[in-house]
Amino acid sequence: MWASGGGPAADSNHNVYLSTGDGTFDVDKAGVDYGDSILKLSPGRLLLLDYFTPSNQAVLESQALDLGSGGVLLLPPQSTIPNNLLITAGKQGLIYLINRDNLGHYTMSQVVQQNGNIAGLFGTPTFWNNRLYFAGTTYTGGDSPRVFSFLGGRMSANPTSRAAGTYPYPGAVMVVSANGIKNGILWALQHGGTSSGNDVLRAYDALNLGRELYNSDQAGSRDLPGIVGMQFESIIVDNGKVYVPSTGAARLSVFGLLH
């Protein structure tokens, strides 16, 4: 498992959910291998409780289209049935919305919804205020961050807005800062976003990604975090500040309001 820097998810009963990368899948033939699968593990001993494997797993494995490049996101309880859902996507760019109380094994019976309206995902989706955020990409071409509405236990078929420009591989790890359900800001780190190769921290209106609020290339060299260097660092927002690790520049950049 790798999830491009994302960690396992856990529900209120302490069950653990994670995705796996390319490899052998032979559970349907009494084997023990779970390549390109979502696993649900018990608390404590981490015993296998349930799993989901796409019906095209053999294609994913043969073409290096890891499901495990994307992390697993558990969604808040829904008023509709099924009310406990998870969402993920992998390199193929196919989003899976799944009933996490019955993952379905090697069938598509418990897939509540599929959506192919993103490029391949390297990272974990982001959720805020009935919205889902993705920043997909491929090894050879970029894509832009986009947001889908999420209502009635289903996501919209098409993005409600998307950011201008493209994010090259590996896309972006994104996080939302907000005052509850108000004043949402989506933060994203764009790799190699300047002509000099520096990475750029960008802030968008979380309700309309077409509205950029800030980017770290606006003030010359003052705000540039440098070349991050590693592929899958996660940015962190806490107490009014944004923290960006930069192994390439051997520093931790901290962004906040100037006083």
What positions do the PLM features span?
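Extracytoplasmic/lumenal domain signature
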Residues: M1-W2, A10-Y17, D22-S69, L73-H259
